[in-house]
């Protein structure tokens, strides 16, 4: 707006906004300015206001509503769900009705025929982590397992109890400010690629850079992480490999995306850190959730919809679930 940015750098024909429900005040101001500077620009915003759980960072799903009202945007409801079983979808649909001011006009439609299983367990004492652990230890359902919690403290307690019970737990901890390119193995691969001074790498260059890192870090515990990352990138970009695409791929990825846990290992995480993930069997602990507003309801909804097959929700506050749910 001040004219300090060259016009050529802000001239755009198409703008795609992913996770639009997470737009904050500054990001939305940028979007509005780009629209002002490009009268014929097409804008596509993809988001789910039911999954806005980053209000503490300044995100506001109201910006999506503003795009509809101020710019006359067309709204397309994408209601098909290919992840979750019928039982999980039914619970999520019933629960999300309690959130006010929603944009979606209809229920989610499950596309899987699997019935799945849902269990709601109300506890009358606040210390029920051991009950969750006992259920996990005795459960023989196939597939991977994840425990999602409302707080970091609860995640630590459940992780410790699982390990004490003999069931190995992997605690997902916050890595704010951490990037995959900070790891020596990734940095070495990037340096090897940059030596070619080529925007688009052919298969030979890519293989040579990969082999160089393998030789240098043959004993590294993070080499598998790099290998998994490169395999995922190859799958997404099977023909042309541009360095800028790889840079963006790293920026958009998390270390958990390339960590292949064993099925016997239980992943323990807060709900906020698990957004975007999915697991066959999900246990949710809502300990400490007492003041239930729309913000908390959205968090619970995100936790529920991480489950693919089976879901078990443990809580001690009767206000979390209505009689209808």
Task: Describe the role of every protein-language-model region.
Residues 9-10, 38-39, 138-143:
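Glycine-rich phosphate-binding loop signature in dinucleotide/nucleotide-binding domains
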Residues 103-104, 319-324:
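Short, charged/polar "capping" segments at the starts of alpha-helices
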Residues 86, 146-299, 304-312, 317:
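Core RecA-like ATPase module of SF1/SF2 helicases and allied nucleic-acid translocases
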Residues 1-10:
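Conserved helix/coil segment N-terminal to the catalytic DExD/H
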Residues 14, 21-113, 146-164, 172-180, ...:
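Conserved helicase motor core of SF1/SF2 NTP-dependent helicases
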Residues 13, 116, 143, 309:
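Nucleotide donor/acceptor-binding cores
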Residues 123-142:
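Conserved interdomain hinge at the start of the Helicase C-terminal
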């Amino acid at each position: 707006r001040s004219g300090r940015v060259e016009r050529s750098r802000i001239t755009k024909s198409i703008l795609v906004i992913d996770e639009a429900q997470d737009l904050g005040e500054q990001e939305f101001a940028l979007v509005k300015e780009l629209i002002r500077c490009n009268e014929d620009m097409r804008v596509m915003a993809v988001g789910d206001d039911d999954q806005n759980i980053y209000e503490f960072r300044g995100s506001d799903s109201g910006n999506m509503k503003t795009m509809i009202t101020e710019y006359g945007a067309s709204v397309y409801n994408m209601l098909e769900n290919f992840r979750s079983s019928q039982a999980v979808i039914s619970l999520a649909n019933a629960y999300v009705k309690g959130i006010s001011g929603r944009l979606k006009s209809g229920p989610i439609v499950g596309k899987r025929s699997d019935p799945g299983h849902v269990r709601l367990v109300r506890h009358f004492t606040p210390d029920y982590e051991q009950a969750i652990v006992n259920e996990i230890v005795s459960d023989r359902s196939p597939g991977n397992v994840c425990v999602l919690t409302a707080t970091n403290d609860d995640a630590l307690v459940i992780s410790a109890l699982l390990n004490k019970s003999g069931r190995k737990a992997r605690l997902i901890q916050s890595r704010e400010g951490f990037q995959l390119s900070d790891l020596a193995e990734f940095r070495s691969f990037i340096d090897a690629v940059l030596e070619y001074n080529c925007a688009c790498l052919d298969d030979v260059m890519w293989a040579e850079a990969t082999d160089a890192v393998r030789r240098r870090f043959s004993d590294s515990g993070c080499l598998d992480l790099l290998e998994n990352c490169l395999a995922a990138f190859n799958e997404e970009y099977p023909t042309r490999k541009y360095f800028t695409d790889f840079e963006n791929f790293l920026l958009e990825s998390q270390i958990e995306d390339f960590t292949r846990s064993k099925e016997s290992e239980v992943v323990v995480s807060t709900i906020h850190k698990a957004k975007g993930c999915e697991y066959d069997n999900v246990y949710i602990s809502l300990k400490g959730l007492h003041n239930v507003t729309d913000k908390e309801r959205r968090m619970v909804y995100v936790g529920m919809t991480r489950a693919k097959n089976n879901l078990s929700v443990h809580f001690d506050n009767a206000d979390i679930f209505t009689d209808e749910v």
